[in-house]
Regions:
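Acidic-basic catalytic patches of nuclease active cores, encompassing PD-(D/E)XK
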Residues: 1-36
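Acidic, metal/cofactor-coordinating or nucleic-acid-engaging core segments within structured domains
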Residues: 81-101, 112-114
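Non-catalytic C-terminal interaction segments of nucleic acid-processing enzymes
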Residues: 2, 6, 20, 24, ...
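Amphipathic coiled-coil/heptad-repeat helices and related helical stalk/stem segments
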Residues: 15, 38-40, 83
Length: 160
């Protein structure tokens, strides 16, 4: 498992920073993680009281600022299409929305966006087969990837 490597541990630390930032804005909600020692269909659930409110996929980026994400990537978030499909299935089974969390560590910002609800994508998603990094630890793979426009995402700023 990637999570057992030094780079994997950095990913775990970044997800914890994501959780703390989210919960600082929404203290009534909890970010409940899936186990990190085995593959999971999604990264977390958003829970308030005894109710599940959303399925969450979280990605953390250390290689860019918010400005670079905007200027060079046009606010397009790349997520494997398999992960998107898995999260949509989980959201349907739980009858809750699927929300994307993109934490940009150098800028200490969390972009959040509802991606899917009630059997429908909430905005256009582009699917392309591209060569991307295979895992946290490197390597490359050719696979279907989704590009999600985050330009209308909520921006939660840390240390504000």
């Amino acid at each position: 498992m990637d999570i057992l490597t030094p780079k994997g541990q950095i990913s775990v630390d970044d997800e914890q920073a994501t959780r703390r930032l989210w919960e600082s804005y929404y203290p009534d909600y909890r970010y409940i993680e899936t186990p990190k020692n085995k593959p999971a269909a999604f990264d977390a659930l958003l829970v308030k009281g005894k109710n599940i409110y959303a399925v969450v996929e979280t990605k953390c980026r250390r290689d860019m600022t918010l400005e670079k994400f905007s200027a060079e990537y046009n606010m397009q978030w790349l997520v494997t299409y398999k992960k998107i499909r898995d999260c949509c299935i989980a959201a349907d089974l739980l009858a809750v929305p699927f929300v994307g969390f993109l934490y940009i560590q150098p800028s200490n910002v969390l972009l959040t966006k509802e991606i899917y609800r009630d059997g429908m994508f909430q905005q256009h998603i582009t699917i392309e087969q591209t060569r991307t990094q295979a895992t946290t630890n490197g390597g490359y793979v050719l696979r279907d990837n989704a590009y999600i426009n985050m330009s209308q995402a909520k921006i939660l700023r840390g240390d504000a």
